[in-house]
Amino acid sequence: MKRAFERMSMAIAIRNQQKKVKIDLRQIRRRVQKLLRLVDCREKEISLLFVDDEEIQEINQRYLGRNYPTNVISFSLSEGEFSSVNPDVLGDIVISVDTASRDAERGNIPVSDELDFLIIHGLLHILGYNHENNNPEETACMQKKEQELFFLLHGYPLDF
C-alpha cells in the first residue's frame, strides 16, 4: 500500500511578467520538475520569474549593484542567515527573456533551449556552483554539470 507522504510533489512557482515572447509555462514546469529530480531536490520548492531587460536591470542594480541587464539572476534561500527559516525552499531564479532571446538568436538555437539552459544555470548557482570567482576548476565543474543536465533534459547536447 502506498503512503500519501511518499508522493510529495515539489512546489514550483512560475510567473511571466514580460509580454514580448510567448513562453510555454507548462513545458517549463515539467522541465523544472525533471531538473529537481535529477539534482535530488524532488521535494524542494523553487520560483521562476520571467521578466524583460528593464526589470532585470532594476533587480541587478538593487541587489547586486550592477546597473545593466543580464540573462539570469539567482537568489539562494538554502544558504546564509535565512537558510534555516524553511529548508525546503531552494530560492528564486529571475530570467530576462529579452536577453535570452538575443542570446538564442546569436547562438542560432531555439529560445526554449536558451531558457532551459538559464534555468539550469540559475539552479546550479542556488545549489552552490560558481563560475564568478576566477577559479577555473569550479567554472569547468559548473559548465560540465550544465551540459550534463541539459543533455539529460533534452537527449541532445547544447552547443553554444
From Swiss-Prot:
This protein's record includes keyword Transmembrane helix: no
Subcellular location, record wording: Cytoplasm
Record's GO cellular component terms: cytoplasm
Residues binding Zn(2+), per UniProt: H121, H125, H131
UniProt cross-references to InterPro entries, sorted A to Z: MetalPrtase_cat_dom_sf_prd, YbeY, YbeY_CS
UniProt keywords, alphabetically: Cytoplasm, Endonuclease, Hydrolase, Metal-binding, Nuclease, Ribosome biogenesis, rRNA processing, Zinc
Primary location group: cytoplasm
GO molecular function, one term: RNA endonuclease activity
Regions annotated as coiled coil: none
Any single Pfam family the record assigns to this protein: YbeY
Cofactor: Zn(2+)
PROSITE patterns per record: UPF0054
Keyword Cytoplasm (UniProt): yes
Known EC number: 3.1.-.-
Family stated for the protein in its record: Belongs to the endoribonuclease YbeY family.
Protein's job: Single strand-specific metallo-endoribonuclease involved in late-stage 70S ribosome quality control and in maturation of the 3' terminus of the 16S rRNA.
Matching HAMAP family: Endoribonucl_YbeY
Protein name: Endoribonuclease YbeY
Native source species: Syntrophus aciditrophicus (strain SB)
